Amino acid sequence: MKFRSTALVKGFRQSAPYVNAHRDKTVVIMLGGEAIADPNFANIVNDIALLNSLGLRIVIVYGTRPQMRSLLKQTEHHAPFHKGIRITDEQTLELVKQIAGQLQLDITARLSMSLNNTPMAGAQINVISGNFVIAQPLGVDDGIDYCHSGRVRRIDTQGINRMLDQQSIVLLGPVASSVTGECFNLLSEDVATQLAIRLNADKLIGFCSEQGVLNEKGQILAELFPSEAEEILQRLEKELTPENGKLTGTMRFLKGAISACKAGVPRSHLISYKEDGALIQELFSFDGIGTQVVMASSEQVRDAEIDDIGGILDLIRPLEEEGILVRRSREQLEQEIAQFTIIEKDGLVIACAALYPFPEEGMAEMGCVAVHPDYRDGDRGVTLLNRLRSKAKQFKLSQLFVLTTRSLHWFREQGFIEVDVSHLPIKKQKLYNFQRKSKILVLKGL
């Protein structure tokens, strides 16, 4: 008997808009050495291969920190830090080159796998590495010579784009050469950040030990503006102690995400390398799974347009069937669309409300208030109310009223008071359904 899964079909359909949206988009992925050493790394590679097959243009930047620490311990070589950056002398550089070369080969081999009965079957991915990044030395700081520790000087964006146009994956590490033919040890997060900026990437994705950025209660912060992310980073830096004075992977990635967004990269994502499928869930679901640092919110509050009617109908139809909202036909919505305000997220209408002015009485009705079930924990109802209050003020109206059967307490929390039918505009009084017995509430003094 064949196994049938409607969940698979549903998930496939829900991800379709994101498949279309991400096709031909450039994504820079930061893979720290911790992610490479984690047992989940094989699944991460499988997911990256899936993104490649879906038409995303992928650049991978890998790090070597834990592998380097292990090798330094084995060789009993000391490589001190200055201001969070490892000082790379000649011997340290040779060890970095050894580890970076080994990881490059290991990652390339993993991406080249095409065994049957595995997610990589038939993938045939071309992995390209090269001298796309030109480095320069950090020099001397406070009398400390960084030796072969360096920074990005130049990036061959044309060369990288040629490889990406051929659907190859570009793989780069923390070692880059200079115009003088020397090698330098770079911070992998800085390499990834500069690549995202100079390639005009659509996304920068960092794999961390945590599932994104957490607040003080340990809850995931789904979305941050750069200014908010900076405040969190400053708080985390203040919590560092002399015994634990180095930035964590999450802090390093967050720092890169802030820089990338400020420089024009639309979205930077921080997700866990321990969570199986985190990359797919972050990119192909409405809410994602980690934290994204965004130039602008992915949610937009705006006036509804005729093209939004389908989304509004999808939102309000379940509430109409439950009797919570009065049924509206498509034709009625087309006539009233100018009255509606919506909150949109990634093309999905997640909340709506309409404003019906009664200028003779100096009042307006707030009607057809609906919020998608997945988004009712936030303050979107308050956002819509404030937007409609502003509109009512523009119309020189002084009162806002609602008719509700289920949300009496919520409206009272917002300052509405319960009144009887006589307080309604005359036209509305004539249309009041006494069988429905909706509660009438008024907000005065807009």
From Swiss-Prot:
Its annotated pathway reads: Amino-acid biosynthesis; L-arginine biosynthesis; N(2)-acetyl-L-ornithine from L-glutamate: step 1/4
Q: Could you name the domain of life of the organism this protein comes from?
A: Bacteria
Reaction catalyzed: L-glutamate + acetyl-CoA = N-acetyl-L-glutamate + CoA + H(+)
Q: Would you tell me the Gene Ontology cellular component terms?
A: cytoplasm
What EC number(s) does this enzyme carry? Answer: 2.3.1.1
Location(s), subcellular? Cytoplasm
Q: Which InterPro entries does the entry link to?
A: AceGlu_kinase-like_sf (IPR036393), Acyl_CoA_acyltransferase (IPR016181), Asp/Glu/Uridylate_kinase (IPR001048), GNAT_dom (IPR000182), NAGS_kin (IPR033719), NH2A_AcTrfase (IPR010167)
Alphabetically sorted, this entry's keywords are: Acyltransferase, Amino-acid biosynthesis, Arginine biosynthesis, Cytoplasm, Transferase
Major place of residence? cytoplasm
Annotated N-acetyltransferase domain residues: 299-438
List the Pfam families hit by this protein, alphabetically.
Answer: AA_kinase, Acetyltransf_1
Say which enzyme class the record assigns.
transferase
Q: Which PANTHER family match?
A: AMINO-ACID ACETYLTRANSFERASE, AMINO-ACID ACETYLTRANSFERASE NAGS1, CHLOROPLASTIC-RELATED
* Family according to the record: Belongs to the acetyltransferase family. ArgA subfamily.
Q: Which HAMAP family match?
A: N_acetyl_glu_synth
| Name under which the protein is recorded | Amino-acid acetyltransferase
State the species of origin.
Answer: Aliivibrio fischeri (strain ATCC 700601 / ES114)
